[in-house]
Amino acid sequence: MTMPKSCVCRKENVMKQIEKLMDYRQSIRLVDATLRDGGLVNDFYFTDEFVKALYQTNIKAGVDYMEFGYKASKEMFDVDKFGKWKFCDDEDIRAIVGDNNTDLKLAVMADVGRCDYKTDIKPRSESPIDLIRVATYVNTIPAAIDMIEDAKNKGYEVSCNIMAISTAQELDIRTALEMLGKTGVDIFYIVDSYGSMYPESLARLVYFYKEIADKYGKKLGIHAHNNQLLAFANTCEAVGDGVDYLDATYSGMGRGAGNCQIEPLIAFLHNPKYNVYPVIKFNEEYMEPLKESGVKWGYDLQYLMTGLLNQHPRTAIAFTQEGRKDYTNFYKEVVAQD
């Protein structure tokens, strides 16, 4: 008996969906940003035991990049008020990783206007670092380009992470990406700093980014915040839209509402190179005690409010630190600022 054409089509569509669910892109790169974004929560005071365990866990879990922290200026920031991962000296990284004879690559972030990159970032041949992530706003792109070219000339992989992208105008974004496309930068990063984006708005932005990235042969990355409980959903959306570099953190640790959690993301990617068990073990042995010690991050109403209004979470962070619970008053305050 011949199967009706409509049934054949439905069966083919079902099989395509099953294949999509079971398939994975080999170009995906998973970036652990726990120390860097999580360091904003505890001023980068992680013990060496914690950092070594995180490094070993990333290796076992198949994570592609581990971001150690910032390359912040010691002239601008008091070294006595921050842990070592605010500054990421090469010797401190080597004390953790040795020669790093593994597949795990190492990254640091350098903020425009907050680092002495010409002196503090050594040539790649002298450093354990593989990737320099240049953080900028859309209005500081010329300074970012100078940093990008400096890092490329020193032999590094380089990304450009344009922060607070949800507040930028499309014409400004296009101009910035066209300027960046003509540099040696390897990756354009979409950064939802305020956790204000939804999957559909992110999809439109990725399409826009990808048009220019493809023109210049660049890769795309995503860094999501969890103010509206959408960091994981937005990262998954980005994967489906062709983004390759995915930032995530253990237990979602990060400034304010935190970031995309690495645990469900590993499961979502369907790639046999990734192993979620070491991540679960690290969470049990290190992240849960860190929470119990009083270090706070994660979704709460105050972060939802700033995300809804596309505002920087600094007011919500202050609300949390002050131990306030008057959410309705806080809502009135942030609406008045909008």
Regions found by a protein language model. Give the residues of each.
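Methionine residue identity
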Residues: M1-M3
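Catalytic cores and adjacent flexible loops of soluble metabolic enzymes
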Residues: C7-D338
